């Protein structure tokens, strides 16, 4: 039982320690990445403090200590130490690291949605599934019966501006459809289609 616990603890702690170091080494990683969205997402500068990797290091130390306790047949002490460490590590990681990862993965899209908050416009995501537009855009209630039809928003006779958040790896597909690029930030772009007055 003690060796699998040690291996698992060291594996998890290595991952937890390595992830915060992305900001330091992203310029070396980018040449090996083939996905345009991932590359563009890494252009975001998340504000790392520099000590987040210590959470993983702490878990590694605790894993080795617990392994030593298991080897000495002090199972309850080893298990208690592991449980307490996870009670510290998980909330610490959630508070200090996860928000910074969110900066790369979805913050630009959420900021786009928030910038449209309260405006009388249509807001949708294109090329990816998301419910963020419903939570963050707070747009005015829709009255047109076709507002839920993405094809109508893209090509139909819309009655107000339609804004779309698209991942950059799908950008070329949609800028051909009478959509205008407003801004690109990280791995996302904000597009708009204005109503045509007949």
Can you say where each PLM-predicted feature lies in the sequence?
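Membrane-embedded architecture of ER/inner-membrane glycosylation machinery
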Residues: 1-198
């Amino acid at each position: 039982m003690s060796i699998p616990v040690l291996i698992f603890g060291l594996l998890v702690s290595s991952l937890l320690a390595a992830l915060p170091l992305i900001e330091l080494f992203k310029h070396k990683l980018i040449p090996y990445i083939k996905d345009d969205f991932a590359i563009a997402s890494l252009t975001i500068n998340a504000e790392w403090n520099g000590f987040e990797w210590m959470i993983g290091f702490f878990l590694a130390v605790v894993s080795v200590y617990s392994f030593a306790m298991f080897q000495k047949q002090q199972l309850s002490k080893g298990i208690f130490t592991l449980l307490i460490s996870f009670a510290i590590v998980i909330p610490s990681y959630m508070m200090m690291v996860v928000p910074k990862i969110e900066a790369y993965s979805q913050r630009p899209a959420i900021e786009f949605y928030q910038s449209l908050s309260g405006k009388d416009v249509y807001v949708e995501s294109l090329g990816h599934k998301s419910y963020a537009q419903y939570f963050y855009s707070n747009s005015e209630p829709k009255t047109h019966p076709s507002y839920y039809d993405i094809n109508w928003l893209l090509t139909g006779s819309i009655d107000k501006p339609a804004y779309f958040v698209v991942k950059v790896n799908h950008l070329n597909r949609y800028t051909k459809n009478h959509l205008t690029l407003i801004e690109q930030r990280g791995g996302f772009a904000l597009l708009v289609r204005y109503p045509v007055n007949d």
